[in-house]
Amino acid sequence: MSHHWGYSKSNGPENWHKEFPIANGDRQSPVDIDTGTAQHDPSLQPLLICYDKVASKSIVNNGHSFNVEFDDSQDFAVLKEGPLSGSYRLIQFHFHWGSSDGQGSEHTVNKKKYAAELHLVHWNTKYGDFGKAVQHPDGLAVLGIFLKIGPASQGLQKITEALHSIKTKGKRAAFANFDPCSLLPGNLDYWTYPGSLTTPPLLECVTWIVLKEPITVSSEQMSHFRKLNFNSEGEAEELMVDNWRPAQPLKNRKIKASFK
């Protein structure tokens, strides 16, 4: 059962393969992005992020991160162009972060770790719903954005202010009118490669689009993330920190860059 996995010594990423053998597959994520070997591909289009009618619904602690969930019943918020064919709908975003500011991201750049990483998860509308999309190699497009320590982010402020209400696993709170555009950097240059979900079931259904330019987050804002709990209410407190999977082997994949 997938609720057995986590990020501790006993149930963490090193052990996921026992229950999810695809953990050792050929297109696992995250990966280290070696900027020396990533190839500029002039055929890659700029990303088209159409979040103008976006409708956020709730914020939820699922016991391994927290998700901000969106209404994906229509094309309210879509990602297209870039390396993608067709249109991909935003369903949720979540973060991965560390126990300290020196680690937390899942992807790394020339082995450098960032303090956190934002994943905006989109599914290919040609498959009808998220559950069907994950069964296909082009089912999902995940936009990955690094967070580096610096000035506080206005976009993140609304999120950090809501976290106290979802401290423990299973808690959910209304979270309307959040504009995910507030979490995008000014420059949308990206790296792209074929990969997987970074949490079980680790399905190899993701076109990864990792932005080169990080957004900033203050140490104070990061401290709110680290007050969340992996556990449910009434259980022994386990702080939600280091919920990141380390870089996986690239195997025969190539990482392409949209920029020179």
Swiss-Prot record:
Pfam families reported for this sequence: Carb_anhydrase (PF00194)
Cofactor: Zn(2+)
Keyword Hydrolase: no
UniProt keyword list: Acetylation, Cell membrane, Cytoplasm, Lyase, Membrane, Metal-binding, Phosphoprotein, Zinc
Domain Alpha-carbonic anhydrase: 3-259
Residues annotated with Phosphoserine modification: S2, S87, S165, S232
Residues involved in Zn(2+) binding: H94, H96, H119
N-acetylserine sites (modified residues): S2
Summary of subunit composition and partner proteins: Interacts with SLC4A4 and SLC26A6. Interaction with SLC4A7 regulates SLC4A7 transporter activity.
Protein function: Catalyzes the reversible hydration of carbon dioxide. Can also hydrate cyanamide to urea. Involved in the regulation of fluid secretion into the anterior chamber of the eye. Essential for bone resorption and osteoclast differentiation. Contributes to intracellular pH regulation in the duodenal upper villous epithelium during proton-coupled peptide absorption. Stimulates the chloride-bicarbonate exchange activity of SLC26A6.
Record-given protein name: Carbonic anhydrase 2
